[in-house]
């Protein structure tokens, strides 16, 4: 049972990273559907850097930078050229999928040494929960820390208030003297950096190898998590653990030979994602609460 819970916790980490970053981008009014592509670029960059330098911490840095740079491509078109955000995000996912496959081709079949666990003294000795909560890699701790910082930033700081104002009414924010495009560029860049970290976690912790498309739809699940969380950071943790548990059920079912077709088991995380979105959509009041009023709307700065 302990091993199962540990696996659920680890599986939720990349979702926490990616969903937290996307939440910040969406609270600024930008809908970036390219999370999957950014995660793939983060994954391949992390694996390549770790293979070349022999240091997984270089892989973390490379993954974060790759995600941020991929997000900058999105910003160039969606913010700089005012292209449709949905179409641009989908194009970014296709771009990231293709480029990551090309960059990762020489590394197929290789393995790397993953991140070591960092046990927290004294806390790890707590009965039952000590090993479950206080004996993880640095990125697992970082994901929780970033989630808490984002919640504090959005609700307790002036900069967070400005970001939310830009997402709720970019015209009013501009009239008050705020630089809408700069705020959104920063939010999208942060979202890309987080997606890159989420992607980097896959080859550095979960599976110490590179394979094309190894994110396996986690970027889309992260997008659904933001809606599930109603754009509230603390709820992302609950959603990530829920979807992580469903993913582990799928893998456990395949390993134990449940009398269910493997294709049906593989569908479980994505069917759950669709069902959650359908339930939320039917409850219109819940679906709209905390939703940024200008989400996905193009902003053209008046001269």
Q: What are these regions, as identified by a protein language model?
A:
Residues 1-18, 31, 45, 52-58:
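Membrane-interfacial amphipathic/re-entrant helices at transmembrane-helix boundaries
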Residues 18-19, 43-47, 97-98, 142-152, ...:
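Hydrophobic core segments of alpha-helical transmembrane domains in multi-pass membrane transport
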Residues 54-99, 242, 247:
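Alpha-helical transmembrane segments within multi-pass membrane transporters and channels
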Residues 85-87, 113-118, 135-142, 184, ...:
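Loop-to-transmembrane alpha-helix initiation sites
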Residues 97-156, 256-265, 292-303:
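Transmembrane helix-bundle core of multi-pass membrane transporters
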Residues 132-210, 233-238:
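Helix-loop-helix "hairpin" substructures at the membrane interface of multi-pass membrane proteins
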Residues 150, 168-182, 253-303:
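Cytosolic-side transmembrane-helix boundaries in multi-pass membrane proteins
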Residues 206-270:
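Transmembrane alpha-helical segments in multi-pass inner-membrane proteins
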């Amino acid at each position: 049972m302990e091993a199962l819970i540990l696996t659920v916790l680890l599986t939720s980490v990349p979702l926490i990273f990616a969903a937290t970053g996307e939440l910040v981008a969406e609270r600024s009014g930008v809908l970036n559907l390219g999370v999957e592509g950014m995660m793939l670029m983060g994954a391949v960059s992390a694996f390549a850097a770790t293979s070349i330098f022999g240091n997984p911490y270089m892989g973390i840095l490379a993954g974060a930078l790759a995600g941020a740079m991929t997000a900058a491509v999105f910003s160039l078109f969606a913010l700089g050229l005012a292209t449709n955000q949905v179409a641009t995000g989908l194009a970014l996912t296709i771009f990231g999928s293709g480029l990551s496959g090309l960059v990762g081709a020489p590394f197929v079949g290789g393995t790397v040494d993953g991140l070591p666990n960092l046990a927290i003294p004294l806390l790890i000795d707590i009965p039952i929960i000590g090993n479950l909560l206080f004996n993880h890699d640095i990125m697992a701790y970082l994901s929780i820390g970033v989630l808490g910082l984002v919640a504090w930033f959005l609700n307790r700081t002036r900069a967070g208030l400005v970001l939310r104002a830009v997402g709720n009414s970019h015209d009013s924010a501009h009239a008050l003297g705020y630089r809408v495009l700069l705020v959104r560029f920063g939010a999208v860049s942060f979202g890309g950096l987080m997606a890159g970290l989420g992607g980097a976690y896959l080859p550095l912790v979960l599976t110490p190898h590179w394979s094309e498309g190894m994110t396996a739809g986690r970027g889309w699940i992260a997008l659904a998590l933001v809606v599930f969380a109603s754009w509230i950071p603390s709820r992302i943790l609950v959603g990530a653990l829920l979807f992580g548990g469903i993913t582990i059920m799928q893998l456990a079912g395949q390993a134990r030979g449940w009398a269910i077709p493997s294709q049906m088991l593989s569908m479980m995380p994505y069917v759950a994602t669709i069902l959650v979105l359908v339930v939320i959509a039917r409850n219109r009041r819940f679906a709209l609460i905390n939703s940024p009023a200008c989400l996905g709307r193009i902003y053209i700065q008046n001269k």
